From Swiss-Prot:
NCBIfam families: PRK05610.1 (NF004123), uS17_bact (TIGR03635). One of its GO terms (molecular function) is rRNA binding. GO terms for biological process: translation. It comes from Burkholderia multivorans (strain ATCC 17616 / 249). This is Small ribosomal subunit protein uS17. One of the primary rRNA binding proteins, it binds specifically to the 5'-end of 16S ribosomal RNA.
Amino acid sequence: MNDSVKTSLKRTLIGRVVSNKMDKTVTVLVEHRVKHPIYGKYVVRSKKYHAHDEANTYNEGDLVEIQETRPVSKTKAWAVARLVEAARVI
């Protein structure tokens, strides 16, 4: 057989943290562009995901990468993998 290193086949998404009010959970807004079938215009579609944040380290406005994982609760089956860009503080 092949003794190569296993790679993760879990889905990853990049989105912005819109809420961190829950304990060990952040709400991540993921946006993607879809071409309208009739008019041809690109429309922004979005979806919110609850992601596991074990240490409560991520704040609103942070750009994070989330990775699919086993279900942690009724609505949470994603975990924050890494911080892509921290929120700008004004």
